[in-house]
Structure formats: C-alpha cells, structure tokens
Amino acid sequence: MPEPTKKEENEVPAPAPPPEEPSKEKEAGTTPAKDWTLVETPPGEEQAKQNANSQLSILFIEKPQGGTVKVGEDITFIAKVKAEDLLRKPTIKWFKGKWMDLASKAGKHLQLKETFERHSRVYTFEMQIIKAKDNFAGNYRCEVTYKDKFDSCSFDLEVHESTGTTPNIDIRSAFKRSGEGQEDAGELDFSGLLKRREVKQQEEEPQVDVWELLKNAKPSEYEKIAFQYGITDLRGMLKRLKRMRREEKKSAAFAKILDPAYQVDKGGRVRFVVELADPKLEVKWYKNGQEIRPSTKYIFEHKGCQRILFINNCQMTDDSEYYVTAGDEKCSTELFVREPPIMVTKQLEDTTAYCGERVELECEVSEDDANVKWFKNGEEIIPGPKSRYRIRVEGKKHILIIEGATKADAAEYSVMTTGGQSSAKLSVDLKPLKILTPLTDQTVNLGKEICLKCEISENIPGKWTKNGLPVQESDRLKVVHKGRIHKLVIANALTEDEGDYVFAPDAYNVTLPAKVHVIDPPKIILDGLDADNTVTVIAGNKLRLEIPISGEPPPKAMWSRGDKAIMEGSGRIRTESYPDSSTLVIDIAERDDSGVYHINLKNEAGEAHASIKVKVVDFPDPPVAPTVTEVGDDWCIMNWEPPAYDGGSPILGYFIERKKKQSSRWMRLNFDLCKETTFEPKKMIEGVAYEVRIFAVNAIGISKPSMPSRPFVPLAVTSPPTLLTVDSVTDTTVTMRWRPPDHIGAAGLDGYVLEYCFEGSTSAKQSDENGEAAYDLPAEDWIVANKDLIDKTKFTITGLPTDAKIFVRVKAVNAAGASEPKYYSQPILVKEIIEPPKIRIPRHLKQTYIRRVGEAVNLVIPFQGKPRPELTWKKDGAEIDKNQINIRNSETDTIIFIRKAERSHSGKYDLQVKVDKFVETASIDIQIIDRPGPPQIVKIEDVWGENVALTWTPPKDDGNAAITGYTIQKADKKSMEWFTVIEHYHRTSATITELVIGNEYYFRVFSENMCGLSEDATMTKESAVIARDGKIYKNPVYEDFDFSEAPMFTQPLVNTYAIAGYNATLNCSVRGNPKPKITWMKNKVAIVDDPRYRMFSNQGVCTLEIRKPSPYDGGTYCCKAVNDLGTVEIECKLEVKVIAQ
C-alpha cells in the first residue's frame, strides 16, 4: 500500500453536521442540499506526476507553514533549501491556487526575497504579504527545482477581520462571487450561461440575520438558505460558518472526523481522512450502509493515527453517503460527483422553408438525454400544450419542431448546454405564385379601348407600370382588382398609350409583361445609322441591314438600287419583310455591291421613303515578294513594293515575318506597324538559311502573306589569326606558327593561306611595330606560300634565297571569304641561326643507374642545338658495340636501349653533342647487378655446452653489389631439415646457441646483397656434436648495470609553418629509462581525446599530427616527458597560413 499523501490543496472542509441524520429527509421523499467540500484531484498522468514529485522531496530542509493574519497586517512565509550538493542556485516559484504564478504579482502588497548563507550553505526564500486583504486568503504552493530534482509544498493562508462581530457582516454581499481574487472565484457561478433578463423591481423585504438562520439550520438546508438570500459563494460561506462553530463536541474515538461533504469531478480521485484518538481501534468504511472492501477502486492507507480511504475514477454511482466506524462511534460525509459540461458535437444548420410547412432544427450533444435549452432571438422557448413549438429528444439528438411555419417564425434559433452553444437562422418564404392567365400583347386602333387582363393563384394586390413607370389612374385609365383577377382599362386609345405594360404582384418577384400597339402611318426608323445613312461592310461577310418600320396595317416595303428593284427570294441580294422591320440581305458582299439603296413603305395611312449608302471594304492584296539586298553575319536588308489593291482603305503599315528554310514556323519580327517599304531584320543565326515575307495592313485587317523571298544565309568572315610567330629559320626555309582566330563564326574555318613578299621589291612600309595594321603593299606583290588551304597552324616556306628578308602574313578562309590578314611584326632574315648544344640530363640519371641482370635499359637524354648536332657515345672511353647496345638519335633527344642487361654492360657512358665548333659532354654511370655467390669456406671453430662458434669467408663474387648480410641455417643430421637461425647477419662469425644436447648438427651460410640471397649456400664439412657429458658450465657473476636515466630530448621541436587545410606534424625524440610518459600540450593545456590530433611514439620518436589545421590551431605547442627520475619539456611555435583563393 503506498504512503499516504498530504491533503489535497483544493480540499475545503465544511462544518460538521448536527446530530440529526440526513437520511430521514431522504426517506420523506425530499432531495436535501448537502454540505460539501470541493475536491478537484488531477486525474491520470497529472496525479501520477505529483505522486512522483512528492517522493523526491529531498530539497526542502524547512517548508513554509500555513498561517492566519488579520486584515491590514503583514505575514511572511519562509522556505529553506540545503545547497551542499548543488552546483548552482535552485529555481523556486510561488503559486496561489493551481496556476497563478506570484512572480508577476510582486509589488505593493507582495515581495519575494532570497538570501544565501555561505557558512551553512543554505538558501532562504521568503514571500512577504503586506497589508493583507480578504481576497488574499486561500491555498498557496511553493515549488523548487534543480535539474531533475523537484520538491513542492502547499500551505494555507486565512485572513480574519480585524474588528467587528459576526452579526454585523453583510453575508449576502460578502459571499457574492466577483470573478476575481481567489482561485475558486466564480467557480460555482453558472449565471454566464443564462439569458440576461430585465431586472424586476421587488418589494423590500425585512432585514434578516442570515448567520442566525445558518447556525440554527440543518446542514441539509444550507444550500436552500444560500440561494434564497442570494449567496453564490457557497464555499466561502461554509468556511466562515465552520470558523464560527469551532466549539463542537469532540469525539472519544475520533481526534479528527470527516468533513461534512466532498465534491469531485467525474473520473477524478477523492481522499477521505479521519484521525483516531486510539490507533489500536479497528476502522471500517461504509457506502450507503454497505461495507467497502479494498480493491483497485477503493484503497486504504494507514499513517500513524490517520486512516485514509482513496476512491479512484469516481463515477455518478459513487455520488452517495459514506461513513466510517471506530468502535461504537461513527462519522459520515457526503460525496458529490460533478458531471463534465455538456458539449454541442453537431451544430445547428441554417434552414429555409415555406409558409405553412413543418420545420425541424436538429443538433447533437456529447451525452445522452442531456438537459438543453432552446432560444429564439435570445428568448427562451418554453414548449406547452398550446405552443406551436415541440422538442423531441432521441439519445444525443435534440430536435426543435415548428408546426405550420409563418413569416413571424423567421429568426435566429440557438441551443445552449452547460458547456457550449450553437445557433442557426431560419428563413420562411412565401409559396410560389402561379400565373393562371397571363397578359397578352394588344394592337388597337386609335380611339379604341385597351383592356389588359390577367389572373394569378393568390388574392393579393399588385402594381401596374408602363415602360418602367407607375401607372396613374385617371378618367381615361382605370385599374380593377377583383379577387384573383386584375385588369387595366384604357378608354379612347391614343398614340402615347403604346408601350410595354407590366403587372407585378406584391410580395413576389414576378412580373407579367404585355405590349400595346396603336395603329400609326408608316415610318422608317434610321436612328441606328450614321448621319449620312452609310453602312460599311467587309467583303466576303454577310450584310443584314435591318431597318425598323412602323404602321398599321403593316406597310409594304420595296427596296431598289438605281432602276433595279430588289425582290424577296433566295438570291444573293434579297429582302426580308417583318411586321416591325424590313431587312436588306447580301449573303457574300463583293466590291461591286457598293452603292445607294432605296426603301419605300406604303399602307393605307400613307407612304415613307429613305436612301441608304452601302460601302463594301476588303483586306488589301498581298505585297510582292520582298527582295534581300544586303546580308551580314546576323542581319540583312530587305525591300518590297506596296500591294496593287488597298481594299478600299488606306494601307496603315506592314508586318514582317521570317523563318528558317528547314522550318515551317514563321516568327513575326515587328509588333508595331512598319510604315516604310524597307526593313532590317536582326538577331539571326549565322550560317542558317532564312526566308522572309510581308503582310499589308489596313483598317479592315491584315492581307494574306506575300510570297517568301529567295532563301539567304547570314554569314561573316572570321577574325584574323592570332600570335603569328617564327618557329624556325634555315638557309632556304622559314617555318611560321600561329593560333586560330578568336572568332570563327557559323561559316566555320576551311583553312589558312600563308603569303610572303621580299623586302625591297615594293614600297613596303610598316604601320606599327606590333604588326596589327596592314603593310602598304600591292596585292600582286604578295606570294602565296601554300597552293591549297592548310588545316594546321604551322607551315614551312621553302625555296627562299639565303640572306634575303621577307614579310609574312596569314589569312583565315571560310565560306564567306578570307579574313583580315595577320602580319608578322618585322622582316625575317633567311639565314639559319647557330644554337650552342646543351644536354639536359634527367635527375634520376645524375646518380648511378642500377638495374638487375635480364632487365631492359631504356634511357632518354634530351638535348638542344641548331643546326642538328652530331652525337657520339662511348663506354669507358671506347666505342660502343652497337650489336649489344642500340642507340637512336633524333633532333631533340638520344636514346640508349639494352633489351636484356648483362653485368658486362656496367660502366661509364659518355655522350658528346657537337654543333659546329661548340661541344657539350655528359656522363652516365650504369650498374648491372646480380645475386652474389656463396661464402667461400664455413668452419666450426668451437663447440661447448649447447653452443657452436662458426666462421666463414666472404664470397668471391659479390654480384656487382655490396654484400649486405648473411643467413645462417642449421640441420639435424638425422632429418637434414634446414631451419633458419639468423637472418641479415653482417659479420663473418657467429655463435649458435640453444642447441639440443645429444644431437649432431650441420650448418650452412647464404650470402645476401640488394638483389637477394645467393642461389647456393656453403655447408660445413664436419658436423658439431652436442655432447651429453661435460663440465658444468657456470655463468660468471656480473654486477647489474644501472640503465636508469632521467628523460632527455635528443631532437628538439622546431618552429613550424603550416598551410591551412593540409595536415601538419611536429616531431621530436626523447630518451629515458624507465620509458617516459609523453604528454602534448597546446598553450599550456593538455591535448586529450581531441579527434583533430593524433599522437604517435615509436622507438623514442614522438609525433603530433594536426589534421587539416586552421588559423585557430596556431599557438605554442609543448611536449612533456615524465618518468620516476624527472620531468623535461620542450616547446615550439606553430603558425597556420591561409592561401588566398
């Protein structure tokens, strides 16, 4: 069973009940109001968290205690925290109620202080309340946290009146909730959910002493008295009453009894606590007379004299009476379980209905059979027997039913629960109106009566209008309404009575139109034409010229053009007659249809005549195909002639289009009309064939396109070649070299033409010394050096006379022609220049070149010199045998090649390069090596104990390389299996130890050079027998040598410069015995477990590698060596440089 917890913060005790049993009133059939205490236990996870926190109460050494203060006085609460195990100051918070943080309330009436005593290492936190007020009373909480540690403490503050007696208190004003102050203020006031009503004036009642009523009343009557006299703060009233009735008789069995009542939310947890006078008494708990047994729902705890009952997951069935017995005595209490607020889960929806229909407004709430209230425009709906409103409940559904809806029912309806509300609008419309007899159009003679009559389905009034204006009754005009029939009677019809009449029933958006026509002489209405009665039509379109006419009887219309009458029929040009118009129709207008047309109207009332001018306009003809007169790299110039026919309207301008020849998509080049007959298209792709065409534009539109122009290709020559230089000169030739042009273009590059001319043959004059401008030479004086175009950028001009001076230029040629020439900056003398020879020995040949027997030797030695030098090779001063060694020479290098090297090829090779009288020599040492021969003689010098002393002589043949060591092997005479004893041994004598006594051994020795071991080994002729019997060998006694040595650096650190981003290393060497411990430091701080550094120590050499250093890694680095005999340090500086990008 868990440890009992402290009484909940929000548990408020109620006065003890009087001796009367409240169950008697229950039996009488009444529902008494109960004394209760509000218990709001945090459910689930929050409670578990608080229980866990209470178990970690390890921070407070002194907790604040509850207290009592009078109004206007001061009080201080103190909390202390031990700081021995804390590295920093803990965090403390003061709360009032559950969540009100008092840190933001500090000021005139509240001060928070904190101090720290260094000797005792105790933090003291104080909360001082200055000039306390009534609303300061309540439950307070202090919380302290440090990292993962937490501690909390709750305490109560009671504020008493400083003076006065209880009967003088206005209890009804003191305990009305204001919604401010304590944490439970306004908690029981549900007036915010009720509709605001007008305050009714009540008759003044005589003054009543409510305290006396409460003191003498039963606890079951407290709530009744509180609501009767307007007391809403029931909890505060019970607290005050409890303090007034403290002189209660104490029980012999209970030192502290149950509170009169408890309240808890549904699903919450409640705790009942009693304190026994004698802890040995047996306690039993009962619910409604039934004994409670321990379970997961009911948990019993014992804490000293306290007996505690926990009820988990409280439900509505737990709302009942509980009592506890101890011996012959018992104490009881009431538990009230408060249901959660009812929420609206499905909102009301706006509804539209017709008058007389049944309307249903439906919503859903979170609980079945919940109590909800309906409102209409804020007024509560109370259904009754005579009311048209009914309310139906189906589980969670609540439906408001309105029978026979009227326009008065259109309003905003809302539903309200304890936890939410919803509203919707109801619109009630009239029934659709049916037209039984509509109005009809009428034609009347002048002076006759006009009667407009209609019949509708409803007996409602209406309004008459003529041409949108209300009809005014007069002696001649009467409006008649009889039941569903409406009439408009006009006597003695006049011409102005003609028009559109409309009847509109009231309250409906319905109109009944009718036209009245009064007979009149024929008229031709030409208001829709121009001032000169001209009609313009586009050729190819259909002309339908409708001329409004009037007259009664309808006049006969006759159309004519000149002397030719136009008849009705199916021809291209025809007329059509209608009661109110006559129409001239031309199906496909042509240019020849232009002219003056006449219309004649005739009826019994008279005649009318009119003339109309018809003008037929057309698109212009397409222009003639344009001509491209000039072409550039990305542009051209084009011209064209205007079209022969402008379509009867002046040409406004032209549109130009172009396309690639291989494409079918035309692209417009101008969006503003081109007024001229010439245009320059730009931004074309060089080397691509194009076509262009023209559109003519007049006021009617755009003509058809002209025929495309002949295809043309924008091309441009390349830029001149660049960097023309002299590559070489001989007595009869000049070799020139150049670079390709910077800009080649779409026409590409077909090749180059190299030209030259002799100095003095013309008036050659150089414009500048850089050769960028042309020489002042006639074109016929230049000689083409290459008959055909050349692709390479190097060419040799041959057949030149010696000592002549020539000018040279080069041109780039493509499909557009030859580019501007590139000139050499000065005349060239045709005479070969002697260049002294020079041998470029490769670096690896400046030392002895070593190869093994059988490997190939291939050495390339470059040289310089002009004209081509003469080369001579010698080996050790003698001519080289070309049958064994191949020599190949070129203009720039010589190659010595030996396919399969032999030891006889070793020696000194001399190379001589000669140009005219200039000579250059160089030497190369070649060493061909092979495996050595075996040692000459191997002897056994001495045998003693388990040891054998061997000596041998070096081999006669060292393989043309120095002997680097020997390998010694031994073999037992029985098995003759050879085992290596010593490898890479440098001396010619050795002692073989740890041989097996009683065995007989043979020994052999291999020679070794840089090629490897000798193929054969020399074996001892005689064997060495390790005798079993012999003298006992006694090891001589030597004094132990002291190898201890303090650390000493044999190679110091040096100052180093490193490049940022490249690994850097610091090296030093140290000696000492015992082996010293190495520690690296940067700026006097030891480097430990840093991934940017790696430390190595091998055979006394200490290395610190800094991976990809940055300027931050610069500084002073120190290597420290420590052993038992001493400590030594050495420093250096590292600077990291950043290479600018």
UniProtKB/Swiss-Prot annotation:
Family (UniProt): Belongs to the immunoglobulin superfamily. MyBP family.
- What name does UniProt use for this protein? Myosin-binding protein C, slow-type
A GO BP term here is: cell adhesion
The encoding gene is MYBPC1
InterPro entries per the record?
A: FN3_dom, FN3_sf, Ig-like_dom, Ig-like_dom_sf, Ig-like_fold, Ig_I-set, Ig_sub, Ig_sub2
Q: Which domain of life is it from?
A: Eukaryota
Q: Which GO terms describe its cellular component?
A: cytosol; M band; myofibril; myosin filament
Q: What residues does the Ig-like C2-type domain cover?
A: 72-144, 251-340, 341-431, 432-520, 522-619, 837-931, 1047-1141
Annotated Fibronectin type-III domain ranges read 622-721, 722-833, 934-1029
Bias (Basic and acidic residues) ranges: 1-10
